[in-house]
């Protein structure tokens, strides 16, 4: 459960109470809270060092629009030679971001930007004129704290007295616009105030105390609407530090992190390197989300996150893993899977498509199409050979790789010792016919490669010898040359070598034909085709193209069209990344990824739900505007179904003097005014205008501020502070 949720439940419970409020006391005090960053000049040369001719109020140093994601100002230019950067002594623009963001883990070295964050609170008391004020002519809120816990850092002085002159303050608050509010500032050095992310007070640079103010009625704000108020203040140079704030803005904190810092990041009490290190170089250690609630700091540290380091491969032929000894991603070549059980042999890997293979079933008697069972190539059967050749029922088919593959023999054969027997076949049925002696005994003397054949001569009506090739010479395969050696009495069948590459001979007709299966690399992400190099040349080459998984029309831009080397094409949903915590990635099938504002829902009218870039959705009590801010307070009343809630205005109790109708100015008041006038006159006479100004600014003004950080403050009673981490051990 987040801290915000706990607070929300309490607020909601109170806000649902139906008690009618007729009057409320006026709040005499408001607090503006945030983070103060201790800056040591040796770590950031934007502090203490000055450019010739600077020492003046400098406008335009920062952009007029606050970065809505980081909630930290950005310089208008990174060029040190621009007038604002020169006059404002911004010698190292790249370090400006560390004026207002934590950089604890930077090395303790020159110009590293290292800083130390702590909690700070400004207490503003309401004076007699209705202004909430904070005034301090010697504003040194972190003396002996932060770096200066170590006495060796206490080297900067004012009139011989040590002070910490180098710090920056970041305060992110909210307020409900009533109308008529003003904000007045006087001090040194930098001060930038943003309202609704727009720069409204610009007092930049290293300089003596300077003024800046804004009347909120000039900003086009909407009454009763909640706006962010972001204040950024730096003290960058000796030997004075003055601050004066007068405002009628009733600023408040919407939420706190587990360190108790308003709108904090958790950096004040949790450092990932010091508090979350799990000793595993292959995990990314980080502190918990800052708006989570914990009973103590040890619980914070126990809930650190340790995310395994992501090491994505650079291509499909690489595996990338984290090296436990170095914490670096270590790429290695992919070991392609062993597919020998499929009769496949690996031939390498393609960066785009992955592992490639060839079939080992390439023998002329192996079945086509990589027929494989348990790693063994399947042989062609008589049926396979019959289909491959002429499929004649009067022939017997066999396969012999030495003979070039499939071949055939006549099914019906006569007894070679009976020269007058003639075999015949009819639809696979054999029959023997015995010829008359004069038709078969015609004086033939065949050799090994011949057989007797008697043919009747029409001229004399006698049978004469006409030898024929011996049975068995013709194997029925048009892709082999049939050779018979009568002397050696040997018949051979030599395959023709006319078809090359991925082309092979058709045994039924002897033509060279392209065979795509020869080119198959058994990668489902490629298309393999055998293409003739030249028409009629009998030579083919394999052409491989990568498979296109995306459709040619109506492409869904919210789908990733991917390919797996074994499974082929598949789809995954596009994950549109968020931008910060308040812009949610959204996908439209027509246009793809875009960003939408995160919607934070409120459970009741008197609860404001909105998105904060630091943590996401937050909820806080609605502060209502007043119809008469000087005399009445705005209060929120939740509605009951179906009525909505509303804001109302009720009288302050007791009523301010100005709100008392027909009030009589008493002698006590007159006496008070007279005494005050006498005091002022006396100060003016004996102290001069400077003394009078000091008295005028300081009367009825509290000079209170509070700073704390359990990590950077030593124990007050000289015992060991378990949360204090000495410099150099972070």
UniProtKB/Swiss-Prot annotation:
Q: Topology with regard to the membrane?
A: Single-pass type I membrane protein
Q: Which residues lie on this side of the membrane: Extracellular?
A: 24-667
Q: Which UniProt keywords apply?
A: Glycoprotein, Membrane, Signal, Transmembrane, Transmembrane helix
Q: Which sites does the entry annotate for glycosylation?
A: 67, 136, 303, 400, 546, 638
Subcellular location per the Swiss-Prot or TrEMBL entry: Membrane
For whether the record's keyword set contains Transport, the answer is no
Where is the major localization of this protein? membrane
Q: Which GO terms describe its cellular component?
A: extracellular region; membrane
The reply on keyword Kinase is no
Give the source's domain of life in one word: Eukaryota
InterPro entries the record matches? Fibro_Slime, PA14/GLEYA, PA14_dom, Prespore-cell_inducing_factor
Q: Which residues lie on this side of the membrane: Cytoplasmic?
A: 689-730
SMART domains per the UniProt record, alphabetical: PA14
Family listed: Belongs to the prespore-cell-inducing factor family.
What PANTHER family does the record tag this protein with?
Answer: PROTEIN PSIB-RELATED-RELATED, PROTEIN PSIL
Give the protein name, as stated in the record. Answer: Protein psiL
Taxonomic source organism: Dictyostelium discoideum (Social amoeba)
The gene name on file is: psiL
